[in-house]
Amino acid sequence: MTKRDFIDTNTYTKEEIQYMIDLGIKIKESIKNGYYPPLLKNKTLGMIFEQSSTRTRTSAEAAMTELGGHAQYLAPGQIQLGGHETIEDTSQVLGRILDIIGARVERHHTVAEVGKFAKVPVVNFMSDYNHPTQELGDIITMTEHLPKGKKLSDCKIVFVGDATQVCVSTMFMATKMGMDFVQFGPKGFQIKPETLKIGQQNAKVSGGSVTITEDADEAFKDADFIYTDVWYGLYEAELSEEDRMKIFYPKYQVNAELVAKASDHVKFMHCLPATRGEEVTDEVIDSDYSIVWDEAENRKTAMRAIFVYLLNPELRKAQASQAVADKYDAEFSLMLRNAVDDQRNAD
C-alpha cells in the first residue's frame, strides 16, 4: 500500500482526521485504564530536529515507548541533512533503516523533500509554514471540551495575534472540520492571501467559515474557543521584540476584558511556551476555563494516533470501506477491553 506522510493536513479528508481523533482518544482511554496496546511494537522513529523542542520531542518519544516502539533523537550536527550529503540521499538512507521519520525543520521545503525521497512515512513536527501535529492535538482537545449540545462544526474559534504557523494550522484544521475560524490580528500580521484561500476552500466544502478582523467585538462574539501564541515567533526577524510589543500590546493581549466578550462557556488555548504578561495574562492562563495543560498532554495523544495510523495500513484501508472500518473498530475495541480485563484479573 502507498505510504502516507503527515506533512500537511490538507492532504487528508475530514473523515480521515475524524478517524485519527477517535483513534487517539480510544488509545488514551485504554492507557488510562492500565493497558498499553503494543501497536508500534518493533517500530523505530527517527526524529530530526533543526530546533530545540520540549513538547514535540517528549510527546513523540513517549508515544513510541508506550505503544512498544522506540525513538531515536537526531540532533543538528549528528546527521547530514543538506550539508555534505543531499537531503535526497540522507532521506533515502533513513528510509531504509527506520520505520517512520519525524522532522522539525527551519524551512517547510526540507520536510517536504524528506517526505518525497524517504520510503517510509514522514511526520512534520513543525516548519515555518505549519504545525500539523499541534493541529491534531488541538482538535482532540476541543473534542474533549465541546460545549454541551454542540459538535465541532457548531463551534467558533478565535486566534488572537500574529499569523504564526500555529495560527495557520488552526485555520486549516478548524475549516477542515466545519468550524468558524476567526483571526483577530493587526494588518501586516494577518494570514497571507494565498494561504487564506486554502482555509476558505476548506470552509466551502465543510460548511465552516473564515474571518480576518481587527474588531474585538466581532471577533469574540459567541466564541467557544480562544487561542493565542507568542508575539515573537521562531521565524520572525524583521522586527525587534520592542517594535512588535508596540503593535500587539495591549489590544491583542488575551486578558479578562477580552474573554468577557466571548460566550460564557469559552475555553482558552495556547500551544506553549507562553510569555506570561505579553500575549496572555496569568489570570487567563491559570483560570478554570484554561485548557492549555490538557492541550499539552494531547500532543502525546496526537502522536500516538498519527504513528499508529501511518504504520498500520489496515487502518487506512478501513477508510475506503465503512464495513471494514466497523469491523476493525469492533475488533480493536474488543482487544482493548479483553486486555484491560486480563490486567485487572492479574492484579
From Swiss-Prot:
GO biological process, one term: citrulline biosynthetic process
Record-listed carbamoyl phosphate binding positions: S53, T54, R55, T56, R57, R104, H131
Pfam families hit by this protein: OTCace, OTCace_N
Catalytic activity: carbamoyl phosphate + putrescine = N-carbamoylputrescine + phosphate + H(+)
Compartment(s) where it occurs, according to its Swiss-Prot or TrEMBL record: Cytoplasm
EC class (word): transferase
Positions of disulphide bridges: none
Known EC number: 2.1.3.6
GO cellular component: cytoplasm
Alphabetical list of InterPro entries matching this protein: Asp/Orn_carbamoyltranf_P-bd (IPR006132), Asp/Orn_carbamoylTrfase (IPR006130), Asp/Orn_carbamoylTrfase_sf (IPR036901), Asp_carbamoyltransf_Asp/Orn-bd (IPR006131), Orn/put_carbamltrans (IPR002292), PtcA (IPR024903)
Protein's pathway: Amine and polyamine biosynthesis; putrescine biosynthesis via agmatine pathway; putrescine from N-carbamoylputrescine (transferase route): step 1/1
Chain segments annotated as transmembrane: none
Subunit structure, as described in the record: Homotrimer.
Family designation: Belongs to the aspartate/ornithine carbamoyltransferase superfamily. PTCase family.
Cited function: Catalyzes the phosphorolysis of N-carbamoylputrescine to form carbamoyl phosphate and putrescine. Is involved in the degradation pathway of the polyamine agmatine.
The protein, known as: Putrescine carbamoyltransferase
Name of the encoding gene: ptcA
